[in-house]
Amino acid sequence: MAEAVESPGDPGTTTPRPLFAGLSDISISQDIPVEGEITIPVRSRVREFDSSTLNESVQNTIMRDLKAVGKKFMHVLYPRKSNTLLRDWDLWGPLILCVTLALMLQRGSVDSEKDGGPQFAEVFVIVWFGAVTITLNSKLLGGNISFFQSLCVLGYCILPLTMAMLVCRLVLLAEPGPVNFMVRLFVVIIMFAWSIVASTAFLADSQPPNRKALAVYPVFLFYFVISWMILTFTPQ
């Protein structure tokens, strides 16, 4: 860019003058060094080192994950409105519970491979397909919970039913009869209600107020099917 100035000889004409022409008269006799240091606080570096798990041993990592799973189990056993399962979600607990429940539902017959395989696969299909269906239903109803958070909650809340299956296996060691069935029925009903209460305590606030019933109804069916499998289980 240039700036126009009037020529002293001809008032009607102008001659262009550079915009920064005055800066050429400025000179620096010598270079002025810029000195200084950029320091990083020691505490921040220590925090970053402590929070990093790259240098953590495998044993410490496994123990840390197991402690986190155990804390979530306690939240399910003592259900209350909390965002712990939603904030720190994982799928290790649901996987452990699903495998444990499938192994206990596996029949004891060794004569036919069909007695064990379908039962084990059936539990996996019901648990994961049911959890995915409930999650999609929750999202369609306008819930503000993510996909994996819903899977985490639904999977962890199988814990009471897994405990019911363990009790039923122990009761089935005794002589079968009406008393045996009534004991198993009572245990399954209590644990079924426990799973419903625990899951709704975590998922209720994530649904719109006028659609909570529509979101809870599939959860009821989900745990009812698992409870029915536990109640009708008979070892061979």
UniProtKB/Swiss-Prot annotation:
Topology in the lipid bilayer is annotated as: Multi-pass membrane protein
> Which residues in this protein are found as N-acetylalanine?
2
Which InterPro entries does this entry report, sorted A to Z? Yip1/4-like (IPR045231), Yip1_dom (IPR006977)
GO CC, sorted alphabetically, is: Golgi medial cisterna; Golgi membrane; Golgi trans cisterna; trans-Golgi network
Q: Which GO biological-process labels does this protein carry?
A: endoplasmic reticulum to Golgi vesicle-mediated transport
Q: Where in the cell is it found?
A: Golgi apparatus membrane
Q: Which residues lie on this side of the membrane: Cytoplasmic?
A: 2-84, 137-146, 206-212
Q: Which residues carry this modification: Phosphoserine?
A: 7
| Coiled-coil segments on the chain, per record | none
Q: Which Pfam families match?
A: Yip1
Arranged from A to Z, the UniProt key words for this protein are: Acetylation, Golgi apparatus, Membrane, Phosphoprotein, Transmembrane, Transmembrane helix
Lumenal-facing ranges: 106-115, 168-184, 234-236
Query: Which residue ranges traverse the bilayer?
Result: 85-105, 116-136, 147-167, 185-205, 213-233
The similarity comment for this entry is: Belongs to the YIP1 family.
Function, in words: May be required for stable YIPF1 and YIPF2 protein expression.
Q: How does it assemble?
A: Predominantly interacts with YIPF1 or YIPF2, but may also form a ternary complex with YIPF1 and YIPF2. This interaction may stabilize YIPF1 and YIPF2.
Q: Which PANTHER family does the record match to this protein?
A: GOLGI MEMBRANE PROTEIN YIP1 (PTHR21236), PROTEIN YIPF6 (PTHR21236:SF1)
Tell me the protein's name. Answer: Protein YIPF6
Gene it is expressed from: YIPF6
